[in-house]
Amino acid sequence: AGLIPPGWFEHWAGVTWATDPEGLRRNPQMLRAPNGVRLDSRDYAQAGRPYWDPAKVTAPTLLVVAEWDQDTPPAMAAAIFPLLVNSPGKRLVMLGEGTHTMLMERNRGVLFQTVQGFLEEAPAS
């Protein structure tokens, strides 16, 4: 069985495309998206320069990563986690059998439960 249940991707795509009527009117159709993340990646990550300081995070923080995530791999979260020295109640959770699109995948319930549990347990900051 695949990671994404039958029909889920098509549903997601339909809902996502509906958020950009301007992109749908273009020929060929396109989904417009902000590219600031790509610029940050080029100017900071690829240059070996951090663009944020994990030590400045003072709110409860949940890092969730999926086992097979190639976009934000578990090693990335594992490297950041110990740097969150001022985050009360920080938590790092690696979820099995998932990718970067886990919110659509068959194990998405575990993701939702993890986030819900953290929100219910986290002290107000």
Residue ranges of predicted features:
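Alpha/beta-hydrolase
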Residues: 1-62
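Catalytic His-Asp charge-relay segment
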Residues: 58-65, 69, 80, 90-93
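Short helix-capping segments at alpha-helix termini
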Residues: 84-87
